Design a protein with these regions (language model features):
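Short catalytic/ligand-binding loop motif for oxyanion handling, primarily in non-cytosolic enzymes
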Residues: 41-46, 113-121, 174-178
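Substrate-gating cap/lid alpha-helix
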Residues: 117-168
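Catalytic phosphate/metal-binding cores of nucleic-acid and nucleotide-processing enzymes, i.e., regions
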Residues: 85-92, 172-176, 180-182, 197
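Acidic carboxylate-rich catalytic motifs and surrounding loops in phosphoryl-/glycosyl-chemistry enzymes
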Residues: 109-111, 161-182
């Protein structure tokens, strides 16, 4: 089930926000409500090469993503940007669910980015085509991975305030480098496939035991 919204002139999703909140309020205390709201903010921020190339330091990082000149943005500024945007968009809906539900509420951390540029350019989603991915190219993979890590940090801060548990990507789906393994790529620039989804369902099943 997904929130109904318009995209590229078509309605996607099948349930209104009000209907989803009612369904959440009807759950029993022994149920489990799992949110996969949003998730692509890190891709919107970092996938398409920005006209002004930028980078930032993670706290445990001693080098930039590459050696070319880049506009350096303070980590705290990047983190605040993610927290502010998530809080006012995706996490606003998540908070509504938390307030409506009597049961435990969890939120799925989105899968990490794909490292393979060739795969990404085969079938990028309309958002990225409209933002010029075919003309401007793709950002450095390490920058994209760092943007995902910042989104995770932002979600950790927000969900802790809400009392929502975060569910990490299944361990077997992630490379040692931190990127999504290629066998779990969906046929687009950003999403994971059904095999990945099955492993997530296994995680949720284990939580209910």
């Amino acid at each position: 089930m997904g929130y109904a919204r318009e995209k590229n002139g078509k309605v996607i999703g099948d349930v209104s926000e009000e209907e989803i909140n009612v369904l959440a309020s009807n759950l029993n205390s022994s149920d489990l409500l799992v949110s996969a709201i949003g998730g692509n903010m890190h891709q919107v921020v970092s996938l398409v090469q920005h006209p002004i190339a930028f980078d930032f330091f993670m706290h445990d990082e001693s080098q930039y993503s590459d050696t070319s000149f880049r506009q350096i943005i303070p980590y705290s500024q990047i983190l605040d940007f993610f927290i502010s945007n998530l809080r006012s968009k995706d996490c606003e809906r998540l908070l509504q669910l938390k307030q409506c539900a009597k049961c435990k509420v969890c939120h799925l951390i989105p899968p990490p980015p794909k490292e393979n540029h060739e795969h990404i350019l085969k079938k990028p989603e309309s958002t990225f085509r409209n933002n010029g991915i075919m003309e401007r190219g793709i950002s450095n993979p390490n920058l994209r991975l760092k943007a995902w890590k910042v989104q995770v940090k932002a979600l950790e801060a927000i969900c802790k305030e809400m009392g929502v548990e975060l569910i990490k990507p299944p361990t077997d789906t992630v490379k040692k480098s931190g990127f999504l393994k290629e066998e779990f790529y969906a046929n687009d620039a950003t999403h994971a496939n059904a095999q990945y989804g099955l492993l997530v369902l296994n995680q949720l099943t284990d939580m209910l035991k």
